């Protein structure tokens, strides 16, 4: 029986590419993101193994409904990839818009916590894996980076969840890319990772024995 991966931020970039790689490897995928049109297009591309689940990751009812629909369709969840996140329009503690800061924190932290909270009951049944998208910005100090601070949270939380999930045979891991060639970064830069590189890392984690 095919395993199932639930992905947030699945409509583009790292999330979409991870979905493609998972389906190639024989997994089913639950695709959760706000963009209904992009999800539909991706699901059409991937076929019967993909289920589009439009919603807002910071909305508990949206996310709970999506998890339930994914389980109903595929029978369970073997891995969850909490990938949704964003940066600031204008970075910096003094220059950034306060509403933009609040929105980023809500997405990068609360959205990730809700994803863990609502998928853990299913992952416990399968002794599954939770993967979080961190960042190189969460592993070193960057002058004034509020975005980086949210990723420091992700790295700390991943370690704590690894300890918790180990008690019942589950696993938690974090992928921490630097600059990746996605719409997240406006400017080109030599040496950028490709989305395929990050997707391959996620697949390595969830398929590890």
In which residue ranges do the predicted regions lie?
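Conserved glycine-rich cofactor-binding loop
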Residues: 11-12
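Conserved glycine-rich Rossmann-like NAD(P)H-binding loop of the short-chain dehydrogenase/reductase
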Residues: 25-41
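The beta1-alpha1 cofactor-binding region of Rossmann-like NAD(H)/NADP(H)-dependent oxidoreductases
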Residues: 54-65, 98
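Substrate-binding pocket helix/loop in short-chain dehydrogenase/reductase
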Residues: 91-93, 97-105
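Active-site helix of classical SDR
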Residues: 116, 150
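Residue(s) in the substrate-gating loop at a strand-loop-helix junction
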Residues: 135
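C-terminal helical subdomain
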Residues: 167-170, 174-175, 189-209
């Amino acid at each position: 029986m095919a395993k199932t991966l639930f992905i947030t931020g699945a409509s583009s970039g790292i999330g979409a590419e991870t979905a493609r790689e998972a389906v190639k490897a024989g997994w089913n995928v639950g695709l959760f993101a706000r963009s209904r049109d992009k999800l539909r297009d991706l699901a059409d591309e991937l076929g019967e193994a993909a289920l589009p689940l439009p919603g807002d990751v910071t909305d508990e009812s949206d996310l709970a409904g999506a998890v339930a629909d994914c389980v109903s369709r595929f029978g369970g969840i073997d891995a969850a990839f909490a990938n949704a996140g964003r940066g600031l329009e204008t970075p910096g503690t003094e220059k950034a818009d306060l509403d933009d800061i609040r929105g980023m924190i809500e997405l990068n932290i609360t959205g990730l916590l809700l994803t863990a909270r609502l998928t853990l009951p299913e992952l416990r049944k399968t002794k599954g894996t939770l993967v979080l998208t961190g960042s190189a910005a969460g592993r070193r100090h960057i002058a004034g980076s509020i975005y980086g601070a949210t990723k420091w949270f992700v790295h700390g939380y991943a370690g704590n969840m690894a300890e918790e999930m180990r008690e019942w045979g589950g696993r938690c891991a974090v992928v921490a890319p630097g600059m990746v060639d996605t719409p997240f970064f406006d400017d080109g830069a030599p040496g950028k990772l490709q989305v395929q590189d990050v997707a391959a890392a996620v697949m390595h984690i969830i398929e590890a024995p």
